Structures are given as structure tokens and as C-alpha cells.
Amino acid sequence: MAVARAALGPLVTGLYDVQAFKFGDFVLKSGLSSPIYIDLRGIVSRPRLLSQVADILFQTAQNAGISFDTVCGVPYTALPLATVICSTNQIPMLIRRKETKDYGTKRLVEGTINPGETCLIIEDVVTSGSSVLETVEVLQKEGLKVTDAIVLLDREQGGKDKLQAHGIRLHSVCTLSKMLEILEQQKKVDAETVGRVKRFIQENVFVAANHNGSPLSIKEAPKELSFGARAELPRIHPVASKLLRLMQKKETNLCLSADVSLARELLQLADALGPSICMLKTHVDILNDFTLDVMKELITLAKCHEFLIFEDRKFADIGNTVKKQYEGGIFKIASWADLVNAHVVPGSGVVKGLQEVGLPLHRGCLLIAEMSSTGSLATGDYTRAAVRMAEEHSEFVVGFISGSRVSMKPEFLHLTPGVQLEAGGDNLGQQYNSPQEVIGKRGSDIIIVGRGIISAADRLEAAEMYRKAAWEAYLSRLGV
């Protein structure tokens, strides 16, 4: 490792000079608030620094005596690093996609694959090791062997132990502690900042697990932010904050889909099940006897039982049209619905039109990023476009209708329809997942349940079963 040590000081300095290390208060992918954020994506615009990083990564692999046939960079920041390594040293490279394309070869791994060969993984930063493991699994499914990974910076938060538990040796050019030591010696950061970051590292270490799932005896895993903590985030939308607070208070992340055709039944459901839910979803255009007086009664019940009203209108027209649909017509949705939703097909105009009406009334909007029906086209690039649109209009958009967590920003809510206690489907293409799958594994926040409650002999009992299942899945996700 002599070459790596000799080059470490200038390398850390170079990365600091291009603002790869940021100190302050940052929300990480996990939802944790961190005093440091590491972003190496900018080095692609600095060829000399890119080559310097690639060279030291390759030298680290050589010094470790690793034998390998191909190289694969973890998408996306490590891809250019792997490219430079392979081009400079004439080594075959493989590219792992994050998702399968709907056209062409539809392969997850591009390049010449020879089953039985060993592939070396390149990564820029390792925290928990999850991204490396995802790449390992994809490569192993192609018949390749993976034994080692080279990383530029190990954040020392359990990633090395987690990878070791899965049979992967992690070799780092530099640890976060060493990087801080160098920056402090160069007087680029002060002792107080170094201490704060080191305390954060020590207090937030991910638990490793063996192949059988049993935890190894290392420090406690970090918890993601609770609903209550997310409600207090400085950039949280007021409607999202209100919803998260009442969810925490009532211990419910259940939204009732009240798809009934009579106003009397709608109000009965709201009154009887209101204490069990955080939100009531309406399809107001299927009410046979709709009046604005009915919605006034619903607002009264919502205030009494502390739940929000969500009109599942699915706006999908040009801005001027949705604006009129939202504020006018016989439904006057903006006058009573806390939240509405919209498709992103028309482009940002649909959000801008709704926003003109909703912002002054302190309303919010959910974008449809994924759908729970068979053959839905709301996948891939469509979903990513929905996330970008939400980020660009976060003053009005509070989250998503989706089958899983599509944004790692804790300010955004994720609501998932198509939930039943047992997975399955119907004869019209609806697919159902369990609360544990949706909340515990896919990272959603709120389950939307309709027929599982409406069709039950005892609706209150059914609602409580769903509430408890969803809340327990949420607590399990927190590690409580």
C-alpha cells in the first residue's frame, strides 16, 4: 500500500478543492441527518483528477494481490472510474445497468460475459455496502465470481463488515477518519468539525448480517427518520407535515379508499373508521347524490377524527383545463380536498395549473409515479420523470402514488394502493401486496385500502387489522 499512502495527501486535497467533501447538515439516502456529504460525481469534468483517482484504485487492487479477469463499476459514479482503469490497463470491462431496458437485448449486464471468470468491483464511496452487494448479486446471476471490491472512501459505518459477511473483501484507498485527519492537518477543517463527524460515524453504524440473516455483533444500525421527525424537517410541505404529525399521534398510516356511490355511506364510513385512518380517499365523481353540503359534513368529520381528505381525481390535462377542473364545476374540489393527485403525462403544466389554485388554499398534490395494475406503463423513465417534476415543484407537490419508495428525500410521502392482508389480484388486472411488503420492504409510508375494508363483514375490525399491520411494518422498518 506504499504507493497509495504516498499519493493520499495530494488526492484528498484535490478532492477537497473540487468540493467533493461538504460539511454542514445533509439528509442522506437513509434519511439520516449527517454533518458530512461526499459527492464525487464532479470529478468526471476534471480529467486529471479522474485519472488520479482511477490510478490509485487500480494500484490498491494490485497491492492487495487480487486476481481478476474483468472489472465492473457500481452505477453510476464508479462507471467512469472503471472505464479509465480498464482503458489504461487493457482490462475487459462490464457495465451493470440499474434497470432492464424495454428494448434491445434487455440485459442487466453489458459486455462479454464468460461464466466462471472473476470480476472486480469498483466503487467510489461505501457506507452500508448495499450498493456493492446489489452489483455482486447481479454479476453472480450471470455466472461470474466476485470476491473483492475496491473503494475510494470507506465511511466506516459497517459496510466492510456487511460485505465480509457475504464473502466480499473490501479494500479501501482511504477511510473517512483518515481523510478527516489529513484535512485537519492541512487546516482545511477545524477540530470541532472533525469531532462532530467522527461522533456521527461512531453513533451510526449499520448492522451486518450473515447469509442466514443473523446479525453480527457490531454497533447498532442507524434508524431512518420517524414520521414525527420528518414532520419537523425545515423544507417539509405544510400539508405533509400536518399529515405526518397526525400519523404519529394516532399511530396510523392507513388511508381508506371510500369508493362508494352514496353520500350517506361515505359519511358513515368517515365517522365509523375516522379514528383508525390518517386519510380518506374519495372518488367524488362516482357519488350518485353529490352535493357540496355532503363535503362540508365530510370536512367536519375529518376535523373531528383528525384525518385528511384526498380526492383521487388523477388530473391529466393541460394546465388551463386542470385549473378549471380543480376550482370549478359542480365538484369544486379545491374547496374541500386537502390533497389531489395528477399524472405527469401532460408535463409540468398540469402541476402549474393545479398550483395556481391550490397554493393559496394551502393544498397539496401527489404525483402518480407508479400504478398497481398489470401492464402499467408508469415505470422506468416515466417514474424518474415524476420524481424530477416533484422536486422541481416541491412547494406544491408533497409526494407520490407509487408501489415503492421512488425518492429518497424524506420530505416526500409515498402512498401505495393495491394493498390487502394477503397478496393476490383480481380479474381486472389489480395486483395486491401485503402491508409488510409495501411498508416494510418497499419503503412506502401509507397504505391505501378499499375493498379489503369496504367488503368486510365488520369494517371497523378490518380497518383496525390493516392499521395495525401497516403500523407494525413501519415500526419494524425503524428498528423499534
Swiss-Prot record:
Pfam families: OMPdecase, Pribosyltran
Lineage: Eukaryota, Metazoa, Chordata, Craniata, Vertebrata
Oligomer status and interactors: Homodimer; dimerization is required for enzymatic activity.
Region annotation (OMPdecase) ranges: 221-480
Active site: D312, K314, D317
Residue numbers bearing the N-acetylalanine modification: A2
One function term, GO molecular function aspect: orotate phosphoribosyltransferase activity
Function: Bifunctional enzyme catalyzing the last two steps of de novo pyrimidine biosynthesis, orotate phosphoribosyltransferase (OPRT), which converts orotate to orotidine-5'-monophosphate (OMP), and orotidine-5'-monophosphate decarboxylase (ODC), the terminal enzymatic reaction that decarboxylates OMP to uridine monophosphate (UMP).
Region (Domain linker) location: 215-220
HAMAP family in the cross-refs: PyrE
Family recorded in the similarity comment: In the N-terminal section; belongs to the purine/pyrimidine phosphoribosyltransferase family.
Keyword Transport (UniProt): no
Keyword Cell wall biogenesis/degradation: no
EC number: 2.4.2.10, 4.1.1.23
Modified residues (Phosphoserine): S214
Residues the record lists as Phosphotyrosine modifications: Y37
Protein name per UniProt: Uridine 5'-monophosphate synthase
